[in-house]
Amino acid sequence: MFVDDGSRDGTWSFNSSEKRTSIRGLHFSRNFGKEGAVFAGLKAADGDCVAVIDCDLQHPPELLKRCIAWKNGAEVVEAVKASRGKEGIIYKLFAKTFYRMMKNSSAIDLDGASDYKLMDRKVVNALNEMPERLTFFRALSSWVGFRTERVEFDVAPRNAGKTKWSFRKLFRYAISSITSFYKRACR
């Protein structure tokens, strides 16, 4: 399942020109955001397992071979960042603070976590059944509580283009995520 979140770089025309019957795609008319794209892909995917991977190649596709732990009983194989790549000091500090606040407010430890995961069908079904409107895939995929194995990777430089995540967008996303998972709100 390929999800094109309203890109304007020709990605969709390149993908749709290939005659591969094993690959299906969703093409959004505009950018609805990472979370919307991930959850739309999860709803449309129908395999025994589903991998979530960014297309900017900062998530190395060859790591999927190491996600074989899924066949050995892991229900989620999560790729965790051994190194964060070439992030600026401000971004690293912001990420570290955000993860600490998430852990303190929700007991979900996201240190080193990424959205790069391979999940069993029952995990995908559980995520698809959740009523959340403000989604945070990285946390929800941990919160649902399935058996998880971890594999490490080093974040590669972006293959092309620039991130659309400004500091302001990241800050708003962080506040929304923390308040959505605040443990007192769940009581």
Model regions and ranges:
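Acceptor/aglycone-binding surface of glycosyltransferases and processive sugar-polymer synthases
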Residues: 24, 28-30, 34-44, 49, ...
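Short, conserved SAM-binding/catalytic segment
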Residues: 16-20
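Membrane interfacial helix-start motif at the N-side
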Residues: 163-164, 175-187
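Short beta-strand/loop segment that forms part of the nucleotide-sugar
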Residues: 1-6, 26-27
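A conserved acidic beta->alpha catalytic loop
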Residues: 4-13, 57-58
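Conserved beta-strand segments of alpha/beta enzyme cores
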Residues: 22-24, 147-149
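Short, conserved catalytic or interaction motifs in soluble domains
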Residues: 30, 55-57, 153
